[in-house]
């Protein structure tokens, strides 16, 4: 099969480039003594999460589904944030989050 025969849309992921960037980020975090928290808005390619998980970064999530995705594929260090929460959603938010932020 050639690249022109692949079903579209598709993404080409260069694992070596992802790892190079994650190595750089991890190095900066270590030298600055800070914690890295990945935003799903910046990387929603969940098929890469097995690579990201190796680096131990936390993640941010703004929905129940993002929280579940983070818990299942990334880390226990999950920061929930939203301008508003519903009382009905709070049990699941607390179940999947390690931190809850109330922002505007």
Question: For each predicted feature, which ranges?
Answer:
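Generic N-terminal amphipathic, Lys/Arg-enriched alpha-helix
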Residues: 1-12
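A short, N-terminal amphipathic alpha-helix
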Residues: 21-29, 69
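Residue-level detector of functional hotspots within protein domains
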Residues: 3-4, 22, 64
């Amino acid at each position: 099969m050639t690249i022109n025969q692949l079903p579209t849309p598709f993404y080409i992921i260069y694992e070596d480039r992802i790892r190079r960037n994650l190595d750089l980020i991890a190095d900066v975090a270590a030298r600055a003594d800070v914690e890295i928290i990945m935003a799903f808005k910046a990387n929603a390619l969940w098929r890469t999460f097995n690579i990201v998980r190796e680096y131990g970064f936390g993640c941010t999530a703004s929905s129940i589904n993002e929280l579940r995705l983070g818990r299942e594929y990334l880390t226990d260090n999950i920061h929930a944030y939203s301008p508003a929460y519903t009382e009905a959603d709070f049990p699941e938010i607390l179940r999947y989050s390690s931190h809850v932020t109330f922002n505007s």
